[in-house]
A protein has these predicted regions:
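Extended catalytic-interface subdomain
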Residues: 390, 395, 401-409, 450-458, ...
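The catalytic-center signature of Zn2+-dependent metalloproteases
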Residues: 37, 44, 362-382, 444-501
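Solvent-exposed, polar/charged alpha-helical surfaces in well-ordered, non-transmembrane soluble domains
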Residues: 336-343, 347, 448, 619, ...
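Sec-exported extracytoplasmic/periplasmic mature domains
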Residues: 343-354, 455-456, 460, 496, ...
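Auxiliary tRNA-acceptor-end handling modules of aminoacyl-tRNA synthetases
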Residues: 22-330, 348, 357, 363-414, ...
């Protein structure tokens, strides 16, 4: 009862307080009406534009207005832009020394959109385009319910715009902070061993508004610690982390409005090598979900007044040409060659009906332009010792439309192309016979790399199969190769014509790669304007065109990127027969090697140049061996549509595979003593160091006996029958070649023979180390065959038994002590392998 009374008393008290407050409010209001000066309660929620944006504010007009007042930045976002996709691209503008990253390189890329939230808030979502349905379809609601995009930021609406059709939000803390949408990704921070953001040392440098984009420049400092001495760095260690305990980056974030109407998609075709994007498409009338895969390319459209000319086949200029600017930090003498590498693509665009479609230009002296601005495509020049260049692009994920590209050009790529050109052509081009090329030669090397990387930014993938469509003997035909080039595609890793012999007298035009038949055809496929907005109808038009052209010209074949088992599609190779091409290449390497002491000589050099170029010779020799190796157990893959004749998969012909095995016996397993010239090696190579020639021999032998290759040979023979190499034939050919005269084998051959027996032992009795290695390969996506219960193990045992018999016969006629010891050792190893104790 006491509790009830207490509660009742409390209720009465609360009611009195509420009524008292009401009375005060009424009294205050009455007093105000009578002229008494009383303060009104503060107004909550967004203010009007006049109340919030003062005369002190500095305003920029753009895709949305940017206001700066009282040291804060505000975005004024029109309601019409809510729900519109924008792409946010964050790049390094300046980086800490030793980071192995460079100003202009991309940090992060997100598709975002703004939307109204509850309680007067504006949300930013990151859009992940996984699936899509037409909004008029009933299933569109189910798709929307299944794929909710994450909210990555929430902003209070501080005020409404002048006409109340926009929302003003404070973005200061968002850009100063560490939100992944406009900062380093978690992966990048782990890579640099960074911890928390130091907010007191992070700030906004500037925000600039443009008609279709906003550019935000920020400085961000992260706390960091160096790894303990002797411990692994666990990433990309930055010296500043050890010196200062912090790392500072200057970043540029471009927020670019995507087109209201996406470009018409061109559906991906595996017979033409384009980068692609994709999403899952749903519709009410489907019986099977469709994965929409489409090519990545620029939008080229004729001006309305030129449309009829274009249809008649006249060359016309596109509404918006593709322009690449060269970084003003580029050494002046190389700028014309980089620009030429861009403009060289016009010959391909003419096949698609365009003139002046692509233009290389110097960076203008214009303070309104920024190298990091996402509206501009730029060749960025990096002061780096990295021997490389790369060609990325940023595209609209809805359509594949390329929006911009920042080509990465490392200063030391010149070292790479120098060594390539010298080791591949010095036998035939006197200009290649020195460690420092003249500017014209180096400029033309830069031009070829520029064209290759620009090709990537246009959407083109590597075509490693292109060079296989040139017969080897045509590479020595001066008239033909100077007119057509040694490969049909500059997107191949065909480098230079190493097949050409001195007596062929082929000039540089027959040694350098160029934009070829395939490149022109691929650009024609990707950039011909059909005017067709229906992707399926566009595909029908292009499919017939592809079939007709491939039937007429086999040089248009796209062979992929060398990641399968097709020997026609390899990196760094030439011609339609790897054995013949490599024999010519080795002839030239022999000519080059004997001249290296003279060609590498420079004042004060302590044989570093000779050592470097000897390594390049061995490396090139090793590449030739790898080209031949791919033929053994090779499977040809030629993508086709149902309208084309023939199979997609076929074995590498038996005769070619046997030729490869014979090549190894002649060029590799018979010790290549020409690479062991003591007069050269004694200048720089200590004999106790690892022998590079032996390393090449061992690597190829182990690859020939790799369980995955042997298993592939068995499955190919099962599928293709007599047209494929049989496993027992391959193993017999290898054993007979390797042990042709065991009693006279030199130390290199003896080491190889021991390796052979050890590899077969490993097939029969796999160790835990090899099994763990196989498991690791599977874990990272590489297939690894389980051969324990297959013919591979049976054949390995059979080969050891055959070898044991032949060794016993050789032993009877062997008198050399080293050879006898070797034979006895092999017999012991075989016995242990066949009957492990």
């Amino acid at each position: 009862m006491r509790k009830i009374l207490a509660i009742t008393s409390l209720c009465v008290l609360m009611t009195s307080l509420v009524n008292a407050q009401r009375n005060v409010t009424i009294a205050d209001t009455s007093a105000a009406g009578a002229g008494a000066k009383k303060e009104l309660p503060a107004k909550t929620g967004p203010k009007s534009f006049k109340e919030f944006i003062t005369k002190k504010a500095v305003t920029q007009k753009g895709v949305f207005s940017v206001h700066f007042q009282d040291d804060k930045f505000y975005f004024d976002i029109q309601d019409s832009l809510l729900g519109r996709e924008l792409i946010a691209v964050t790049r390094y503008a300046k980086v800490a020394g030793g980071a192995r990253k460079y100003g202009g390189e991309e940090v992060n890329e997100q598709t975002i959109q703004f939307e109204k939230g509850p309680n007067n808030r504006l949300f930013m979502r990151v859009v992940t385009l996984i699936s899509k349905a037409d909004s008029t379809q009933t299933i569109a609601k189910a798709v929307k319910n299944s794929y909710l995009d994450p909210i990555v930021a929430s902003f209070d609406i501080k005020a409404y715009g002048k006409d109340s059709t926009s929302s003003i939000i404070d973005v200061t803390d968002f850009f100063k902070g560490d939100n992944q949408a406009v900062s380093l990704s978690s992966f990048e921070k782990r890579n640099f061993n960074l911890s928390s953001l130091a907010s007191d040392r992070s700030y906004i440098e500037s925000i600039k508004a443009y008609p279709i984009n906003i550019e935000v420049r920020t400085v961000k400092t992260f706390n960091a610690s160096a790894p303990m001495p002797g411990s692994p760095t666990g990433g990309n260690f930055i010296p500043a982390a050890a010196n200062a305990g912090a790392v500072t980056f200057e970043l540029n974030t471009s927020i670019l409005l995507l087109p209201k109407t996406p470009m018409a998609r061109r559906l991906f075709d595996s017979r033409v090598g384009y980068f692609a994007d994709n999403f899952v498409e749903y519709s009410d009338n489907q019986q099977k979900v469709k994965n929409q895969v489409f090519a990545v390319r620029y939008r080229l459209e004729p001006k309305p007044e030129d449309l009829e000319k274009y249809k008649r086949g006249e060359l016309v200029e596109p509404i918006k040409p593709i322009i690449y600017y060269v970084d003003p930090a580029t050494p002046k003498k190389w700028v014309p060659y980089l620009i030429a590498g861009v403009n060289d693509w016009n010959i391909a665009f003419e096949k698609a009906g365009w003139k002046n479609a692509i233009q290389g230009k110097e960076w203008p002296n214009d303070s309104t332009m920024s190298l990091e601005d996402a509206r501009f495509s730029v060749i960025r020049y990096f002061a780096s010792d990295i021997e490389n260049a790369y060609g990325p692009q940023v595209h609209d994920p809805r359509s594949g439309e390329i929006l911009e590209s920042h080509v990465g050009w490392y200063h030391n790529v010149m070292s790479l192309v120098h060594d390539w050109y010298m080791v591949q052509t010095a036998a035939v081009d006197p200009a290649a016979r020195k460690m420092h090329f003249d500017d014209t030669l180096m400029g033309n090397l830069i031009r070829f790399v520029s064209s290759h990387e620009i090709g990537h930014t246009l959407g083109l993938r590597h075509n490693m199969g292109s060079s296989s469509k040139t017969p080897v003997e045509k590479l020595r035909d001066k008239t033909w190769v100077e007119a057509n080039g040694h490969t049909a595609s500059i997107m191949d890793y065909a480098r230079f014509n190493y097949v050409a012999q001195p007596e062929d007298k082929i000039s540089q035009s027959g040694l350098f790669p160029r934009i070829g038949d395939y490149d022109k055809w691929a650009i024609q496929w990707g950039y011909t304007y059909t005017g067709e907005n229906d992707a399926q109808e566009d595909r029908k038009i292009n499919n017939k065109w592809i079939v007709d052209n491939l039937n007429k010209n086999p040089r248009l074949w796209f062979g992929g990127e060398g990641r399968n088992d097709d020997p026609r599609a390899q990196t760094e190779d030439l011609g339609d027969n790897a054995m013949l091409a490599s024999e010519y290449g080795i002839k030239n390497l022999k000519r080059i090697l004997v001249n290296l002491p003279e060609w590498t000589k420079e004042e004060g050099d302590r044989y570093e140049n000779l050592s470097q170029m000897y390594g390049q010779v061995v490396g090139q020799f090793s590449r030739y061996m790898g080209h031949v190796l791919r033929n053994v157990g090779g499977v040809q893959e030629t993508f086709k549509s149902v309208e084309e004749k023939g199979d997609v998969y076929a074995p590498t012909p038996v005769a070619i595979q046997k030729q490869a095995m014979q090549f190894f016996n002649t060029q590799l397993f018979t010790t290549p003593k020409w690479l062991l010239d003591a007069s050269i090696l004694n200048k720089f190579a200590n004999p106790v160091s690892n022998e590079r020639v032996q390393s090449v021999q061992t690597s190829i032998l182990k690859s020939l006996l790799d369980k995955n290759r042997l298993y592939r040979i068995t499955t190919s023979h099962t599928r293709f029958g007599a047209s494929a190499y049989a496993l027992n034939d391959m193993m017999d050919d290898l054993r007979k070649g390797l042990f042709s005269d065991v009693s006279k084998a030199d130390i290199y051959r003896r080491n190889l023979q021991k390796t052979y027996v050890s590899q077969l032992d490993e097939l029969i009795n796999p160790t835990s180390t090899s099994m763990n290695a196989a498991s690791n390969l599977v874990r990272i996506g590489f297939p690894s065959a389980d051969v324990e219960n297959t013919d591979v193990v049976s054949e390995a045992k059979a080969q050891l038994k055959k070898l044991a018999t032949s060794l016993q016969a050789s032993k009877a006629i062997t008198t050399d002590a080293n050879a006898l010891n070797h034979i006895n050792d092999l017999q012991d190893r075989i016995k242990q392998a066949l009957d492990p104790k």
